[in-house]
């Protein structure tokens, strides 16, 4: 194809807003600022916020954002069996993965990769993202970023709670539905 898919463009725009929020104009931005993680909200992915970012800043973010999304797509293919963007049922999960994988150290850390795989499937199979998707997006992004800051010592409460809810939602995906009973 000679043009980007609408799914890719939307994810790219969301990630550009997140990068702008964390960078505050600093090209060497970090996703490890606990206060910024805590104050993150869905407004940074909305049109009004994105239209206020100067074009020269966006130009500086695009390569980094594309790299994060490409890493996330590779992760989804290699670790989760997702072959095409159309197979992602909740596209903002791709943005969460893309955000995490902006950090090269996290992308190369096997513990972070294992954690992200557990988070991905737990979020899907627990029904975490089935309603109030924007709130679920921010809640998951904040908790994932917080839990991987120090992956070896993190208690991973959020992800453990998701794991405990896997296949328990009678209206979404309980054992009987999955086993087609």
Task: Put a short name on every predicted segment.
Residues 1, 90-96, 107-146:
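Charged substrate- and nucleic-acid-binding regions of tRNA-handling and nucleotidyl-transfer enzymes
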Residues 1-102, 106:
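Polyanionic (Asp/Glu-rich) segments that form extended negatively charged tracts
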Residues 5, 18-19, 26, 46, ...:
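Generic intrinsically disordered, low-complexity segments enriched for polar/acidic and small residues
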Residues 14, 42, 113-114, 165:
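Short linear sequence motifs
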Residues 18, 22-25, 75, 79, ...:
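Surface-exposed polar/charged interaction patches
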Residues 125-181:
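Intrinsically disordered, low-complexity N-proximal targeting/linker segments that flank membranes
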